[in-house]
């Protein structure tokens, strides 16, 4: 399929409006509006540390066993999707995975779709897509719908995120899994 070269920013919903206003006033007054030293509500509560190789290996093993994981690392994210820093992770091949997450974890409607994270080098192995989609904003066909029921929406599509070494620890976790 031929697709247009289109860039969609990760904050294409209402949260992007406030960023636009802040940037407008920053330029208007030619000064920084906020101190960029950290997130004011959490920075003092959390001692930053990176996942160790052991943590990544153990997390990958738990995912392989079918456990649902809360993954919290790195900087916070903006936009409508969790992108590997504040994410709920689960195997994509669990038959009732969508139902489990929607009813027991997220407490939302049964029909809500899920995204998937895939290494950029492997995206065309699983989806009708080539190239980057780092923010889960493009809908594409899942190539093997039967093998990945947890990420396949009722219409056979998914909104995957391509992951690169730019998100080093999440990238390592996917490789280990």
Where do the PLM segments sit?
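Flexible beta->alpha loop and helix N-cap segments adjacent to enzyme active/binding sites
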Residues: 1-177
């Amino acid at each position: 399929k031929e697709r247009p070269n289109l860039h969609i920013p990760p904050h294409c919903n209402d949260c992007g409006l406030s960023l636009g206003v802040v940037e407008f006033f920053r330029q208007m007054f030619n000064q920084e509006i906020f101190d960029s030293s950290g997130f004011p509500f959490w920075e003092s509560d959390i001692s930053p540390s990176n996942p160790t190789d052991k943590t990544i290996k153990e997390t990958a093993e738990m995912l392989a066993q079918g456990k649902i994981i809360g993954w919290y690392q790195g900087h916070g994210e903006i936009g409508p999707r969790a992108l590997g820093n504040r994410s709920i992770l689960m195997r994509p091949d669990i038959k009732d995975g969508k139902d489990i997450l929607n009813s027991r974890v997220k407490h939302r409607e049964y029909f809500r779709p899920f995204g998937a994270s895939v290494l950029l080098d492997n995206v065309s192995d699983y989806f009708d897509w080539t190239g980057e989609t780092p923010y889960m904003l493009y809908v594409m066909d899942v190539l093997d719908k039967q093998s990945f029921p947890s990420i396949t929406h009722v219409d056979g599509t998914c909104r995957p995120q391509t992951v690169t070494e730019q998100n080093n620890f999440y990238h390592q976790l996917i490789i280990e899994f």
